[in-house]
From Swiss-Prot:
A zinc finger (C4-type) spans 122-145. CDD domains: Ubl_ubiquitin. GO terms for biological process: modification-dependent protein catabolic process; protein ubiquitination; translation. This is Ubiquitin-ribosomal protein eS31 fusion protein. There is a cross-link at residue 48 (Glycyl lysine isopeptide (Lys-Gly) (interchain with G-Cter in ubiquitin)). In the N-terminal section; belongs to the ubiquitin family. In the C-terminal section; belongs to the eukaryotic ribosomal protein eS31 family. Residues 1-76 form the Ubiquitin-like domain. Ubiquitin is generally synthesized as a polyubiquitin precursor with tandem head to tail repeats. Often, there are one to three additional amino acids after the last repeat, removed in the mature protein. Alternatively, ubiquitin extension protein is synthesized as a single copy of ubiquitin fused to a ribosomal protein (either eL40 or eS31) or to an ubiquitin-related protein (either RUB1 or RUB2). Following translation, extension protein is cleaved from ubiquitin. The gene is UBF9. It comes from Zea mays. PANTHER family: UBIQUITIN. GO terms for cellular component: cytoplasm; nucleus; ribonucleoprotein complex; ribosome. PROSITE patterns: UBIQUITIN_1, UBIQUITIN_2.
C-alpha cells in the first residue's frame, strides 16, 4: 500500500509499505529518501507520536494515509522550583571609610610642631612597621598577630 509523509518543509514523500511494517522500517525508508537519521525522526499520525516497535496496523494506518514528520528536540532540563528561604539573608558588613584615618594615631604639638604617637606600635617582626596596637581599658592588643600587653593592676 502507499502512504504519504509530510516533512517539515511541506514536501510530501510517497512510500510503498505494508500494514505489517514497523515504524522502524518506515523511518528507514524515510532515511533512504531524505537522509534524516531515524533516531532524529518523530512520526505523528492522528495527533499521536508513533512508537518504533509498533506496526502500521496497530495505529490503524491505511492506504493513502498521511504521516507528519517532525525532528526530535535535544536537551531541556527539568524546571526547578524556586527555593524558599526560612531566614532572611544576612546583611553584609559595610566597611566604614574614614578620611585621613591615620591622623587619629598621631598628635602634632602646636607650639613646637613636634609629632607624638598616640598609639603603641606592635614590636613583633611579622607585623612590620605601621601596625598599631588597639587601646583597651586594661591592655594593648595587636589585631594582626594577637600580641597583648596588660597594664599593671594596682591593688
Amino acid at each position: 500500500m502507499q502512504i504519504f509523509v509530510k516533512t517539515l518543509t511541506g514536501k510530501t514523500i510517497t512510500l510503498e509499505v505494508e500494514s505489517s511494517d514497523t515504524i522502524d522500517n518506515v523511518k528507514a525508508k524515510i532515511q533512504d529518501k531524505e537522509g534524516i537519521p531515524p533516531d532524529q525522526q518523530r512520526l505523528i499520525f492522528a495527533g499521536k507520536q508513533l512508537e518504533d516497535g509498533r506496526t502500521l496496523a496497530d495505529y490503524n494506518i491505511q492506504k493513502e494515509s498521511t504521516l507528519h514528520l517532525v525532528l526530535r528536540l535535544r536537551g531541556g532540563a527539568k524546571k526547578r522550583k524556586k527555593k524558599t528561604y526560612t531566614k532572611p539573608k544576612k546583611i553584609k558588613h559595610k566597611h566604614k571609610k574614614v578620611k585621613l584615618a591615620v591622623l587619629q594615631f598621631y598628635k602634632v604639638d602646636d607650639a613646637t610642631g613636634k609629632v607624638t604617637r598616640l598609639r603603641k606600635e606592635c614590636p613583633n617582626t611579622e607585623c612590620g612597621a605601621g601596625v598599631f596596637m588597639a587601646n583597651h581599658f586594661d591592655r594593648h592588643y595587636c589585631g594582626k598577630c594577637g600580641l597583648t600587653y596588660v597594664y599593671n593592676q594596682k591593688a
